[in-house]
């Protein structure tokens, strides 16, 4: 009976080791995906961050990058801990899994909360940002973001083209007689913003605010889904780790 019990325990331990190793390989790839989503958001989808009053969108992306890096390191540590059968390494591995789990839950929660608050924030701040900071010294990022927003989404002004009547730049001598920025034009040529007829500029119902809101919400959904999805998978990793730790403890005694 003793020999049978020892063989059963050893067999169970081996199975757990391979389960955890398989999990760690998948986990490492998941970490790469999480980091990629965070970097993708920062590098390619962050053009409009200067138009947002809150830093939540940016913070969420940074959390994903950090979580992705830690996940990859943890995955490598998990493989090492599994095959060396070192219980102290398994404890460290479990602790890191727990930290990553919390980071991804926070990222997902922030994305969800900001998703709910985005409409109110844009309504409160976007028009003011566009009219007061466009083409103003020290706000080159806002100017670039507004021009890209209006050209990429074929819109003009926060709510409509009339918003530009309140622009500090339009009322200054620097506007050169323009009534809207040139980026409002369907075909951008220098000075085209002097004529705001519908045949010349974009007059989209809802203005740029609805376009920007939809754009950011789509990416918040991706960030939230990735963060929470990987967090759910990690529960299995923590479970396998606990089982292997317990199995090694029983064999030790």
Curated annotation (Swiss-Prot):
A lipid is attached at residues 11, 15, 242-243 (S-palmitoyl cysteine). The chain crosses the membrane at residues 19-39, 58-78, 92-112, 222-242. CDD domains: CD151_like_LEL (cd03155). InterPro entries: Tetraspanin/Peripherin, Tetraspanin_animals, Tetraspanin_EC2_sf. Glycans are attached at residue 159. Residues 40-57, 113-221 are extracellular. Pfam families: Tetraspanin. One of its GO terms (cellular component) is plasma membrane. One of its GO terms (molecular function) is integrin binding. Residues 1-18, 79-91, 243-253 are cytoplasmic. One of its GO terms (biological process) is cell migration. The keyword Repeat does not apply. Keywords: Cell membrane, Glycoprotein, Lipoprotein, Membrane, Palmitate, Transmembrane, Transmembrane helix, Ubl conjugation. It is found in: Cell membrane. It is a multi-pass membrane protein. Palmitoylated. Palmitoylation by ZDHHC2 regulates CD151 expression, association with other tetraspanin family proteins and function in cell adhesion. Ubiquitinated by RNF128 on lysine residues present in the tetraspanin amino terminus via 'Lys-48'-linked ubiquitin leading to proteasomal degradation. Structural component of specialized membrane microdomains known as tetraspanin-enriched microdomains (TERMs), which act as platforms for receptor clustering and signaling. Plays a role in various cellular and molecular mechanism through its association with both integrin and non-integrin proteins. These interactions facilitate critical cellular functions, including cell-to-cell communication, wound healing, platelet aggregation, trafficking, cell motility, and angiogenesis. Belongs to the tetraspanin (TM4SF) family. Interacts with integrins ITGA3:ITGB1, ITGA5:ITGB1, ITGA3:ITGB1 and ITGA6:ITGB4 and with CD9 and CD181. Interacts (via the second extracellular domain) with integrin ITGAV:ITGB3. Interacts with ITGA3; this interaction modulates ITGA3 glycosylation pattern. Interacts with F11R. Interacts with RAC1 and CDC42; these interactions mediate physical association of RAC1 and CDC42 with integrin adhesion receptor complexes. This is CD151 antigen. It comes from Bos taurus (Bovine). The lineage of its organism: Eukaryota, Metazoa, Chordata, Craniata, Vertebrata.
